[in-house]
Amino acid sequence: MQRFLFPRWVNPLLGVFAVATAAGVVFAGAMGGLITDPKTLNVGYEPIQPVPFSHAIHAGQLKLDCRYCHNTVFEAAHAAVPPTATCINCHSPANDQGVTALAAVHPTSAKLAPIRESWQTGRSVAWTRVHNLPSFVYFNHAAHVNSGVSCKTCHGRIDQMETVYQAKELSMAWCISCHRNPGPHLRPKEHVTHLDWDWDTSEVEGKDQETWAKDHMLETNINPLVNCAVCHR
């Protein structure tokens, strides 16, 4: 049988094909690096808010529980942004006679002017969302915190932040890594909002973190799924 030979005019195309292949590899590598770069994933994103609210003071120094402001986190898919009324509980403005209806913590502070304006007009403060997942991603706060996933697992040490920033990458790979091995991220439910609580200095029921997590996962049937429909509904 006679062998098939490519015509000579094909030879230059081999070089073009090689260059195109190399360019494709470089492009794929560059895109892979770009989409996994912390800047692309918004790690460190720290927007200026209309009110300079300090979590370091409120959650850190004053030890306010996360649920005082984000009061739906254990019951709902979304952690509520606190209404102005929550702020007014402590920062009640003074009336014309200088009398405050509730607690008078810095009632005339210029930094709290947007809060007082919001209270008087009934218009919500225009907070800027920091942890902003894509619209095609479903995330349920209640499911996670009720299972024993602490706020700091996803948000970092909020209680040490003067201005809140995105501390974790919140990428699909990052989420899946936890779903595949949730044990190291679990703690007793009563310590979920205690951001300074740590297994390194604590034991629960005489067990270390690894032993407790294994028992907890069996008792509460924690077996996170990783198929697409779990988060993309």
Provide a role label for each language-model segment.
Residues 1-52, 56-60, 64, 73-82, ...:
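N-terminal export/targeting leaders of redox proteins
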Residues 63-72, 84-94, 150-157, 174-181, ...:
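The canonical Cys-X-X-Cys-His
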Residues 98-138, 145-149, 169-176, 180-233:
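Flexible coil segments in periplasmic/lumen-exposed cytochrome c-class electron-transfer proteins
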Residues 78-80, 164-167:
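Short, solvent-exposed loop/turn segments at secondary-structure boundaries
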Residues 136-143, 150-162:
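A mid-sequence, solvent-exposed acidic-amphipathic segment
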Residues 58, 92-93, 142:
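Beta-hairpin (beta-strand-turn-beta-strand) motif
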Residues 75-76, 96-97, 160-161, 184:
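Short, non-ligating residues that shape and space the ligands of small metal-coordination modules
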Residues 47, 53-55, 129-132, 141:
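Generic structural "secondary-structure junction" signal
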